């Protein structure tokens, strides 16, 4: 997928999360708003704040059905409340999935099981739809059972680092199965697929092992800064693909998606920039105030030339002026974002053509949600299942997940 002619892959794309990690990433991707310097904005402000989020925008502007999928409990990171504030019509969490022996590891359903079983609901969503699937197997502490491993672990002596490659490979396989299904079901031909990593894989606490992986005696702050890169890919039919070297981060995803879908983001309160714009400044702020640009990098108080990794120990007056200018921009952006979040300032902004989300319009009660899903299918008749003469395409999804072998899972009705 990374090298597909229809995939734009960004190789200088960084996570920008703080303590909220996954929740901060969701806040940025759905709203182009930074998380907070401490805690999780989705937890502290997701319930009561007003947002102009991707689900609400796409539903109101383009008539999209909106749904999020996660194989864990709905209360984790306050999703069951924050998603209502974002305007998600559906939230398919752990209770929506059949109970299968050995189906869970770590933070929820194993990826291959989760991806396949999610299609039971995806095929019922009226098109067009905006669906977010959150996988968890390739997550710290990188636990994976032997029956799901197909490559050897690293041998650095650090258990966390050593098994990372195995869970990453498992995730890759699950995405491959998912894409095969999209091809078989016909969804691939009219879908924009975005794949992203929400936060760092291996923390800075594992420096000796990181050094071994990088083939170095020791790691520098520059190495650690570059270790904050995460995958970001956009795949769509007719999209002119390639490796894009633009510097950007999670805050930029929503404006980029809006550009691809023909939505102008100029009127929205968003802190990101369109990654496809020629006029973006390519300054990538980290939540702690550090930053990366194509020319310079600041990390843990040290400055580097980004292209070479050479440390700048005694900056010239010209370089220091540049550092100060970049730092002022980063500090200002983060400070303004904090004011927007802490003060719930979007509630004062009446955006023409956008109806503020009323959280009372949404429920994720399973019985009510499934009833609504059936009603929406009959009303719109645009779902994959409806277009297939109301026959399920679930069996078209092929997986080698050993847990599902000879299983016929029963979904809640």
Regions found by a protein language model. Name each.
Residues 1-413:
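Solvent-exposed soluble domains appended to multi-pass membrane proteins
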């Amino acid at each position: 997928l990374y090298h597909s002619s229809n995939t734009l892959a960004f190789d200088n794309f960084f996570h920008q999360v703080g303590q909220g990690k996954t929740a901060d990433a969701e806040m940025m991707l759905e709203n182009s708003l930074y998380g907070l310097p401490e805690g999780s904005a989705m937890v502290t402000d997701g319930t009561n704040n007003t947002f102009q989020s991707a689900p609400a925008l796409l539903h109101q502007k383009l008539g999209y059905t909106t749904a999020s999928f996660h194989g864990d409990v709905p209360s984790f990171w306050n999703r069951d409340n924050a998603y209502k504030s974002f305007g998600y019509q559906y939230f398919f969490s752990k209770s929506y999935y059949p109970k299968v022996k050995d189906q869970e590891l770590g933070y929820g359903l194993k990826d291959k099981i989760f991806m396949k079983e999610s299609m039971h609901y995806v095929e019922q969503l009226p098109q067009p739809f905006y669906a977010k699937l959150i996988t968890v197997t390739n997550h710290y502490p990188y636990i994976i059972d032997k029956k799901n491993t197909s490559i050897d672990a690293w041998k650095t002596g650090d258990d966390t680092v050593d098994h990372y490659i195995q869970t990453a490979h498992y995730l890759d396989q699950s995405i491959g199965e998912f894409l095969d299904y999209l091809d078989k079901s016909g969804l691939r031909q009219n879908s924009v697929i975005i794949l992203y990593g929400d936060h760092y894989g291996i923390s800075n606490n594992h420096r000796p092992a990181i050094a071994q992986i990088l083939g170095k005696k020791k790691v520098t702050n520059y190495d650690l800064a570059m270790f904050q890169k995460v995958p970001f890919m956009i795949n769509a039919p007719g999209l002119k693909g390639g490796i894009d070297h633009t510097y950007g981060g999670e805050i930029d995803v929503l404006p980029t998606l809006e550009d691809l879908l023909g939505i102008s983001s100029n009127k929205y309160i968003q802190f990101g920039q369109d990654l496809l714009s020629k006029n973006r400044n390519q300054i990538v702020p980290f939540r702690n105030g550090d930053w990366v640009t194509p020319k310079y990098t600041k990390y843990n108080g040290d400055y580097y030339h980004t292209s070479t990794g050479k440390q700048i120990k005694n900056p010239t007056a010209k370089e220091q002026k540049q550092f100060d200018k970049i730092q002022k921009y980063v500090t200002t952006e983060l400070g303004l974002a904090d004011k927007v979040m802490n003060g719930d300032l979007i509630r004062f902004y009446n955006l023409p053509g956008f109806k503020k989300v009323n959280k009372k319009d949404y429920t994720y009660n399973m019985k009510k949600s499934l009833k609504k899903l059936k009603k929406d299918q009959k009303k719109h008749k645009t779902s994959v299942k409806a277009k297939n003469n109301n026959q399920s395409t679930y069996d078209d999804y092929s997986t080698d997940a050993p847990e599902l072998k000879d299983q016929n899972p029963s979904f809640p009705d």
